[in-house]
Curated annotation (Swiss-Prot):
Family statement: Belongs to the cyclotide family. Moebius subfamily.
PTM section of the record: This is a cyclic peptide.
Name of the protein described by the UniProt record: Cycloviolacin-O23
Sorted UniProt keywords: Disulfide bond, Knottin, Plant defense
Native source species: Viola odorata (Sweet violet)
Cyclopeptide (Gly-Asn) cross-link, renumbered residues: G1-N31
Keyword field contains Disulfide bond: yes
Amino acid sequence: GLPTCGETCFGGTCNTPGCTCDSSWPICTHN
């Protein structure tokens, strides 16, 4: 399955592959 995106981020990058950080939402989500 896909990795879970749940890291807290603040306009930065996510350590989990396939995840992105939206500047308006401080949690990594699937891109």
